[in-house]
């Protein structure tokens, strides 16, 4: 199995990434588990001002909704999509992240304190190699 936490959204937006770069390292019928920050609904056409308190439009290009990620991983020829869902632990995950003292978590607090959390979630993706 491969487990990816809080990183797949950076490189997984390339449609060929799963088939070419990740699946060669997974045995037949093996699993890929992905957890990434995302948006409840893509709003890149009109980014809410709350989100722009912490992130630039370019930084937000890495965050998408469940539909986007479902469409993206469904293009993979070598894996079966088991599930793509908003994580039930969304609020808890964000709260844990914001408690961290690293510069990124501290910077994210501005948006979340202004109500940006209503636009964001965490997404779980489970795939099985064919």
Language-model features, listed with the residues they occupy:
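Short "lid" loop at the C-terminus of a central beta-strand within the Rossmann-like core
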Residues: 8, 37-42, 86-89
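Short, glycine-/aromatic-enriched active-site segment of Class I SAM-dependent methyltransferases
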Residues: 37-60
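A short glycine-rich, Lys/Arg-flanked "PGG" loop and its adjoining helix->strand segment in the class I
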Residues: 15-31
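Short conserved AdoMet
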Residues: 12, 27, 74
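A conserved beta-strand element that flanks and buttresses the S-adenosyl-L-methionine
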Residues: 3
